[in-house]
From Swiss-Prot:
<comment type="function">
    <text>Part of the gene cluster that mediates the biosynthesis of asperlin, a polyketide showing anti-inflammatory, antitumor and antibiotic activities. The first step of the asperlin biosynthesis is the production of the intermediate 2,4,6-octatrienoic acid by the highly redusing polyketide synthase alnA with cleavage of the PKS product by the esterase alnB. 2,4,6-octatrienoic acid is further converted to asperlin via several steps involving the remaining enzymes from the cluster.</text>
</comment>
<feature type="transmembrane region" description="Helical">
    <location>
        <begin position="79"/>
        <end position="99"/>
    </location>
</feature>
<keyword id="KW-0413">Isomerase</keyword>
<keyword id="KW-0472">Membrane</keyword>
<feature type="transmembrane region" description="Helical">
    <location>
        <begin position="335"/>
        <end position="355"/>
    </location>
</feature>
<feature type="transmembrane region" description="Helical">
    <location>
        <begin position="210"/>
        <end position="230"/>
    </location>
</feature>
<comment type="pathway">
    <text>Polyketide biosynthesis.</text>
</comment>
<keyword id="KW-0812">Transmembrane</keyword>
<feature type="transmembrane region" description="Helical">
    <location>
        <begin position="311"/>
        <end position="331"/>
    </location>
</feature>
<protein>
    <recommendedName>
        <fullName>Terpene cyclase alnG</fullName>
        <ecNumber>5.4.99.-</ecNumber>
    </recommendedName>
</protein>
<feature type="transmembrane region" description="Helical">
    <location>
        <begin position="5"/>
        <end position="25"/>
    </location>
</feature>
<feature type="transmembrane region" description="Helical">
    <location>
        <begin position="241"/>
        <end position="261"/>
    </location>
</feature>
<dbReference type="GO" id="GO:0016853">
    <property type="term" value="F:isomerase activity"/>
</dbReference>
<keyword id="KW-1133">Transmembrane helix</keyword>
<feature type="transmembrane region" description="Helical">
    <location>
        <begin position="138"/>
        <end position="158"/>
    </location>
</feature>
<feature type="transmembrane region" description="Helical">
    <location>
        <begin position="173"/>
        <end position="193"/>
    </location>
</feature>
<dbReference type="GO" id="GO:0016020">
    <property type="term" value="C:membrane"/>
</dbReference>
Length: 368
């Protein structure tokens, strides 16, 4: 039995609004990532120096071989240069933001996968979420995800997705959500454990293949394991719940780490002042701070700022999208819903809010 919920068909005015908003947000994201974060603080000379000398400013060697395929390895070097300074453990704030943003992006990857599977069960259709996730790997979430949400808004009109037709596919989605939640740690582990330079940089490089691995998880679940070997989901929306919970854990880890750092500084600035300072350094780009020399922290600080812009743009993208997913359910007044989504973003994280919004919309729209 299906609960009848009024469908939200977008008017021309709404189409224009979403096109302008998410198109503009994508443009702002691209500008923030590639024209601000990576175009100052002597970032370009620092990258050029690493490429020419094969060493970072602190003397760390640059590994250039990851797959033994020269043409492919050349494409992976920029990611290694970008992330290496964030994973050395030099600054705990880097680790906290890495966990937060990558758990958020993994939740989005799951939302893309479920959306694709609800529309088509063909194996070839999995190229679509793979494309979007690879696109994100190379151009940044602040640019790519608003474009994806714009496309989803235009094509689905915020209507509930159709249920995935087969039990095998539904069960495989649940397994993909559970295993996929750990995918970011295949490259984040050097931030937690002592590792050699080569191991750390190879982990960074090979994580570029995570989108392909994530899609392969779904294929393996559907084609190889079989429905009888996979736990049956209790709800069509269970994968969203898993992804949202994983994103929440990542966000709570970042907030808990920030609170711990603030406690160490509280004797100098007071508890509230210390917490405010740590959260600003964790999430807000320090646009006024410029670097005038090529020191070892130039690239790491630029990469951290890059991820900070990712977080801010994703918040601006996810809150209105989640609102329009939930609005037809009439769960609360518009004002109360907006306040709830903002508070949810603060305390659960943007990735969790979007995944949970999808879950609530689908769970209430489709009776299992």
């Amino acid at each position: 039995m299906t609960r009848q919920i009024p469908l939200l068909a977008l008017s021309w005015l709404e189409l224009i609004f979403f096109s302008c908003y998410y198109g503009g947000l994508a443009g702002l994201g691209y500008h923030s990532l590639w024209r601000i974060a990576l175009r100052r603080r002597n970032v370009a000379p620092a990258i050029k120096s690493v490429l020419q000398t094969g060493r970072f400013a602190d003397g760390t060697p640059l590994t250039r071989r990851y797959t033994n395929l020269e043409f492919l390895d050349k494409k992976l070097v920029p990611a290694v240069i970008f992330y290496d300074g964030l994973l050395t453990g030099a600054c705990p704030l880097y680790r906290l933001l890495l966990v937060d943003i990558h758990s958020t992006m993994q939740a989005m990857a799951l939302c893309m996968l479920v959306s694709t599977r609800s529309k088509s069960l063909s194996t070839i259709s999995l190229l679509l979420p793979t494309f979007w996730n690879v696109f994100n790997q190379f151009y940044g979430a602040a640019f790519v995800y608003p474009l994806y949400l714009l496309l989803e808004a235009v094509t689905t009109g915020f209507n509930p997705l159709y249920p995935v037709e087969t039990e095998t596919s539904r069960s495989a989605l649940l397994v993909s959500a559970m295993i996929g939640s750990f995918l970011p740690f295949t490259f984040l582990w050097p931030a937690f454990l002592r590792s050699g330079t080569e191991s750390r940089q190879r982990a960074i490089a090979l994580y570029r293949f995570a989108p392909v691995v994530f899609s392969l998880l779904q294929i393996v679940g559907e084609k190889v394991l079989g429905a009888q070997m996979i736990p049956q989901p209790t709800s069509q929306a269970s994968p969203y719940l898993v992804a949202g919970c994983a994103a929440t854990v990542g966000h709570w880890y970042a907030l808990g780490g920030a609170l711990g750092l603030a406690m160490r500084l509280s004797h100098r600035k007071g508890r509230l002042g210390a917490l405010t300072l740590v959260l600003k350094r964790l999430y807000l780009p320090r646009s006024a701070e410029e670097t005038t020399r090529l020191d070892a922290s130039v690239l790491a600080r630029a990469a951290h700022e890059f991820l900070q812009y990712d977080v801010l743009v994703l918040i601006a993208a996810y809150i209105p999208y989640a609102y329009y997913l939930l609005a037809p359910l009439n769960l609360a007044s518009p004002f109360a819903m907006v306040v709830s989504l903002v508070l949810g973003t603060i305390f659960l994280g943007p990735g969790a809010v979007l995944a949970f919004a999808y879950r609530v919309r689908w769970h209430l729209a489709i009776s299992d």
